[in-house]
Design a protein with these regions (language model features):
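Short, surface-exposed connector motifs at secondary-structure boundaries
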Residues: 233-241, 300-307
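Bacterial N-terminal signal peptides
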Residues: 17-28
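Intrinsically disordered, serine/threonine/proline
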Residues: 31-179, 370-374
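Short beta-strand edge segments in extracellular beta-sheet folds
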Residues: 179-185
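N-terminal secretory signal peptides that target proteins for export/translocation
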Residues: 1-13
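Short, acidic loop-to-helix structural element flanking the phosphoryl-transfer center
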Residues: 214-238, 248-252
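Asp-based phosphoryl-transfer active-site loop
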Residues: 189-201
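C-terminal cap/substrate-recognition subdomain and adjoining C-terminal extension
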Residues: 38-39, 246-374
């Protein structure tokens, strides 16, 4: 019997083998994409919340964090009256009506049907990952162990991020995209509060805070965007992480704020909030546990990186950052505190707050213009 080697020359046979391998590879990729049973229904929406990825100790693998939220919007209900009454915004009714489109946009994610029990598949490059099951609050997570060559292949070098998309059902052409901010083993990370640090919130006045959060256009703290842009260019690989007690429902509005006023983009670390469980009370509790836990995680994930901490005097940022600086003295490059009015009218005794921390390691300012001159 005549063998295949006698029919084809060796060079031609090699080309056939290579071509066959490529075709099979493509078919396997196609099958792997379409074989995934996407649980995302046509009336459900996903928001991916920007997370971080970092190399493990050996440098050969990276841990990529993914965080998303799946829910069904409720476009029919008007919760204006209930929302104003619950949060004491009745006196801002006329102002809210003036900015009705803003108020409606900010409120709508507080009144959605969260979808639990969903395992969302995502595609990074040509690879498929199925994430952990979503909880009753609709939030889902994933820690993906990948190789350094994969990170090199997948990353967008202009933004130093890895983009990805959710896999939807056949005939569902919607695209739900997210990104993972990559933290090199060494470099500087800027951890920033939001309220009264980069955005005027008036935390000391609870009614003004609620109106600034839910009814009024967001206003930047003067010159802070320029200061952050300056920090971003001081050292290559500088990253930004926005750690706030604000609820995740405000993420779309907050990221639009960053883009509008040209703040550097970065990962977000906000608080979970849901009407139906104890997280409802998180809006009225101290931000300290959430902020400390988040900052310590970033420090532990990236043991060779150095950190700048930026906050304000209105909500325990100075005390939290001082505690972190004492615990990790070699890791904290500098602390910046924006001094704002406090509820009791008293100013912090900063020398007491930062006792034991060199004065060269912390700065208190009322006008960010003074920081631009440094």
């Amino acid at each position: 019997m005549m063998t295949i080697q006698r029919i084809f020359s060796k060079p031609l046979l090699n080309k056939i083998v290579i071509l066959t391998g490529l075709v099979n590879g493509f078919l396997l990729w196609s099958l792997s994409v379409h074989a995934v049973d996407s649980p995302i229904k046509s009336d459900e929406v996903i928001i991916f919340l920007p997370e971080v990825g970092y190399p493990l100790a050996d440098g050969k693998q990276w841990n990529l964090h993914v965080h998303g939220w799946i829910y069904e919007p409720d476009w029919s209900s008007d919760f204006s009256i209930a929302f104003r009454t619950l949060f004491g915004l009745e006196e801002y009714r006329l102002e809210e009506e003036k900015y009705e489109s803003i108020a409606q946009e900010r409120r709508k994610l507080f009144f959605v049907d969260n979808e639990g029990g969903k395992r969302i598949p995502i595609r990074i490059g040509a690879k498929i990952f199925v994430l952990d099951q979503s909880g009753s609050n609709g939030h889902f997570y994933g820690n993906l162990l990948v190789t350094a060559p994969e990170v090199e292949q997948w990353q967008d070098k202009a933004t130093h991020t890895i983009p990805f998309t959710a896999i939807t059902r056949e005939n569902d052409n919607r695209q739900f995209s997210g990104k993972i901010y990559l933290l090199d083993a060494k470099g500087v990370s800027v951890i920033s509060d939001i309220d009264d640090t980069i955005k005027v919130s008036e935390v000391h006045d609870k009614k003004a805070l609620l109106a600034n959060t839910f009814s009024r256009p967001f206003v930047p703290v003067p010159q802070m965007a320029q200061f952050y842009q300056q920090l971003a260019t001081q050292e290559p690989g500088t990253t930004f992480h926005y750690v706030s007690a604000s609820p995740w429902q405000l993420y779309p509005a907050l990221t639009e704020f960053l883009e509008t006023y040209h703040f550097p983009l970065g990962s977000f670390h906000l608080r979970l909030f849901r009407w139906k469980d104890s997280s409802f009370f998180s809006l009225f509790q101290s931000p300290q546990p959430h902020k400390i836990e988040t900052i310590e995680h970033l420090l532990q994930w990236c043991p060779q990186r150095r950190f700048m901490l930026v906050g304000d005097s209105g909500e325990q940022d100075a005390e939290i950052y001082a505690m972190i600086a004492r615990k990790y003295p070699e890791r904290i490059v500098h602390i910046f505190i924006h001094e704002v009015p406090r509820q009791n009218g008293n100013k912090l005794d900063y020398r007491e707050v930062f006792k034991g921390i060199p004065t060269t390691q912390w700065t208190v300012f009322t006008d960010a213009t003074s920081l631009l001159a440094k």
